[in-house]
Swiss-Prot record:
Domain ABC transporter intervals: 5-240, 243-496
Superkingdom of the organism of origin: Bacteria
Function statement: Part of the ABC transporter complex MglABC involved in galactose/methyl galactoside import. Responsible for energy coupling to the transport system.
Organism: Treponema pallidum (strain Nichols)
Database matches in PROSITE patterns: ABC_TRANSPORTER_1, ABC_TRANSPORTER_2, MGLA
Protein name: Galactose/methyl galactoside import ATP-binding protein MglA
Subcellular location(s) per record: Cell inner membrane
Gene that this polypeptide is encoded by: mglA
Reactions catalysed, as given in the entry: D-galactose(out) + ATP + H2O = D-galactose(in) + ADP + phosphate + H(+); methyl beta-D-galactoside(out) + ATP + H2O = methyl beta-D-galactoside(in) + ADP + phosphate + H(+)
Length: 496
């Protein structure tokens, strides 16, 4: 039996930058192959070459033993190769069935046959054991449900190969279990998956094989039963990381940021939140998706209207009616949705690095190009951003490097309070370690840091204390050294 996918000596360059260099691998029917690598390693480029979004420079791609050279994603889909992107690209104001059959609506007498479309959708969902209403509007659905629709859409093309790019980045634990069940079920039917993820625990749970890219070169290709986590880390970063998390040796001082009885005005409403965070402390916020963690950070940064309660800084009551007020008090905020709220996608690295601190780069009342460039170069060096130059568009960078630029933007202001919402989501293990080191270094300098994370090992690995949110209320605050994952889960379900 021939392999469902074979890639031979595939190379791809952009200008003088070689992104893929002679990549070789193959996968059989029903295989679930994990694809790992640091941000910028070439994972996305490889998949875009497979999916017809990029033209390869050299090499060969074979599907079911036959050479293919897809010129577009449409052609790839029609030949059984589908891709579910991390950033779901859907028409949110249209129905599920509209999205399923977009561009290929069944017609009768020149008119869209909605009954057939509805019936075909029901049949498709039933075959995948999915309980989805074809007439539901996409906007009304959760991220996990929308993701299931994308997988169903792939199967409506009789997909042989489905690429999943960071599929669990916005899912709850229960939704991840459901996704894995669907992957296993389709795998038994012969559908092959390429599973792109930075979460090693998931790779070991769901994948039968794993491949690793580093700087465009394949550095590891093995059965999942033959590798250890340390092997994957070494293959990805080119060196051994003795520990998953750096030692948090920051010294915690007195209370600095205090919140008393805080409730917000508009839905979703926070209710009666009280906590205090100390100078030099790394304070974690944990909870299930939709528990109110992001909303609390937004309220602290002046992005949500406070109905009751108060916030104090160094013992003095403060008023936060806008993000401008928060910035004047030397607060910094890195949002969860970096592409939507954290950066200007059409701006350069220099623009995104300096935009939050423009008055500091003036000379004689005018912006100094020299100072702007020096600031960008300073943060590129400090944050180890992989880029061509400060003038490069931030959208051209990998997710991890984009996040480094966003954090660097705030470091230019030397903040006293740093609010980080999922700072390592979608970032490779090497970049994660660097961000952990940065967080600990800032805590050592006496900064007050609040970190939201959905990854329990991460929040237990880098924080001093953890507040657990449940249904927009504070369920409890625990000392990190004296708690565990089970205790965090119990607290997160307290008000459900």
């Amino acid at each position: 039996m021939c392999d469902v996918l074979t890639i031979r000596d595939l190379s791809k360059s952009f200008a003088r930058n070689r992104v893929l260099n002679g990549v070789n691998f193959r996968m059989g029917k029903g295989a679930v192959v994990g694809l790992m690598g640091e941000n910028g390693a070439g994972k996305s480029t490889l998949m875009k070459c497979l999916f017809g979004m990029y033209a390869k420079d050299t090499g060969q791609i074979l599907v079911d033993g036959s050479p293919v050279d897809f010129q577009s994603p449409k052609e790839a889909l029609e030949n059984g190769v589908a891709m579910v992107h991390q950033e779901l690209n859907q028409c949110l104001d249209r129905t599920v069935m509209d999205n399923l059959f977009l561009g290929r609506y069944p017609a009768r007498f020149g008119i869209v046959d909605e009954k057939r479309m509805f019936d075909d959708s029901l049949t498709l969902f039933a075959s995948l054991k999915m309980d989805v209403n074809p007439r539901a509007v996409m906007r009304s659905m959760s991220v996990s449900q929308r993701q299931m629709v994308e997988i169903a859409k792939a199967m409506s093309y009789n997909a042989k190969i489905i690429v999943l790019d960071e599929p669990t980045s916005s899912l709850t634990e229960r939704e991840i279990v459901r996704l894995f069940a669907i992957i296993r079920d389709l795998s038994k039917k012969g559908v092959a998956f390429i599973y792109i993820s930075h979460k090693m625990d998931e790779i070991f749970q769901i994948c039968s094989e794993v491949i690793v890219l580093r700087d465009g070169v394949l550095t590891l290709s093995q059965s999942i039963g033959e590798v250890e986590m340390s092997d994957l880390i070494t293959a990805m970063v080119g060196r051994t990381l003795d520990k998953r998390f750096p030692d948090a040796d920051n010294t915690v001082g007195d209370d600095y940021l205090e919140i008393r009885g805080l409730s917000t005005r508009y839905a979703p409403q926070l209710r009666d939140i009280s906590l205090s965070v100390k100078r030099g402390e790394i304070f974690g916020l944990y909870g299930l998706v939709g528990a109110g963690r992001s909303e609390l950070l937004e309220a602290i940064f002046g992005l949500r209207t406070i109905a009751d309660g108060e916030i104090s800084l160094a013992g003095k009551k403060i008023r936060l009616k806008s993000s401008r007020d928060a910035m004047k008090l030397n607060f910094a905020f890195v949002p969860e949705e970096r592409k939507l709220n954290g950066m200007f996608a059409k701006g350069s690295i220099e623009y995104n690095t300096t935009i939050a601190n423009l008055p500091a780069y003036k000379r004689y009342g005018l912006l100094s190009k020299k100072k702007l460039q020096e600031a960008a170069e300073r943060e590129i060096k400090a944050m180890r951003v992989k880029c061509v130059s400060p003038s490069e568009l931030i959208s051209a960078l990998s997710g991890g490097n984009q996040q480094k630029v966003i954090i660097g933007k705030w470091l230019e202001r030397d903040p006293d309070v740093l609010l980080l919402d999922e700072p390592t989501r979608g970032i490779d293990v090497g970049a994660k370690y660097e961000i952990y080191q940065l967080i600990i270094r800032m805590a050592r300098e006496g900064k007050t840091i609040i970190v939201v994370s959905s990854e329990m090992p991460e929040i237990l690995g880098i924080t001093n204390r953890i507040a657990v949110m449940s249904n927009y209320r504070l369920a409890g605050i625990v000392d990190t050294k004296s708690t565990d994952q089970e205790a965090l889960l119990r607290l997160s379900a307290r008000y459900l």
